[in-house]
Amino acid sequence: MRSPTPIQRRLNELGLRSRLRRNPRLQGRILAPAGLRQRPPATAGLYFPFYHDVPREYAAGLRRHLNAFRELGPLVSWDAALAVLTGGRRLDGPMFCLSFDDGHASWRDVVAPMLADLGVPATFFITTGLIGQPGNLSWADCRDLLAAGHTIGSHTVTHPRLADCDDETAVREIAGSKRELEDELGAAISDFAAPYGNPAVDLGKRDVTAARAAGYRSFATTLRPAMHTGDSPMWIHRQGLHPAWPLLAVRTRVHG
C-alpha cells in the first residue's frame, strides 16, 4: 500500500480534508475554478459518475448534473457500459454510467423517483451491514430498485478500507456481501465497488483477485480518467461527485 503524499498528510493533520467533506458546497466552490480550464468532452469516452446520499435539499443539484450529462451523451446501464468495454457496443462519443454507494434512504425517497422521471438507469452498490439501519434502505427497498430496472452491486459488508483488512477479512467482505445480497434479493450480483476506492491507499491486486474468485464480472475504483473499449471491467474508473457541487466542479472531477 502506498503511503499518503506529504500534501495529503498535511491536509489530514490540519483536518481540512474532513472539513471539506462535511461542507460539500465549499468543496464545490474550491473545485469550480479548475472547471473553467476543462472543456466538456467532444470525443468518445465512457465516464462513471457516482454519488452517495442525496438529501432533498440537493435534489435539484442532482437533476442539473444528470441533465448536463444527457446534453453531452447518453446515460446508460452498467450492462451497456460493460458491453462498451468488451467490444459489444460502439462508443461513438461521450457516454455516462451512473451509480450510487452505500444504501441511503434518500435513494428511495429522492433518487429513484427522479430517475424514473428522467428515464435514467443506475447501479446501486449496497453495503449489506447498513441495510435496515436508521437512515438506510430496507431489503424491500432494494427489491424495489431491482424491480424498477436498476442494477444492484456489492459494496462490502461493513464498508472497511480493504487495504487495512487481512486476507480472510477481505474475502469475507467481498464474497460475503455478494452471498447476502443474492440470498435476500434472489438475483445474481455480479458487480463490486470498493469502499473509498483509491488504488494508491485503499485497495490492492489481492482484492481484485478475491472479487474475481467470488464471481464478480466488474470491480470499481475511484480512478478518474475516461474509459474506452478494451479497458478492463475489473478496473472501472469512477468519478465521485456531490449533488451540491456547481457544474464547473463536476466538469473538474469528471473531465479533468
Question: For the regions a protein language model found, what residue spans apply to each?
Answer:
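Active-site glycine- and acidic-residue-rich loops that bind
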Residues: 131-135, 200-202
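C-terminal active-site subregion of NodB/CE4 polysaccharide deacetylases
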Residues: 1-99, 104-106, 164-256
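Short, histidine-centered active-site or binding-site loop motifs used for metal coordination
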Residues: 52-53, 126-128, 156-160, 193
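Histidine/lysine/aspartate-rich catalytic loop segments that bind and position anionic ligands
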Residues: 131, 138-142, 146-170
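Short beta-alpha junction loops
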Residues: 129-131, 225
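A short alpha/beta connector and helix-capping loop motif
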Residues: 107-128
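Structural detector of well-ordered beta-strand residues that form the stable sheet scaffold
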Residues: 76, 123-125, 153, 219-220
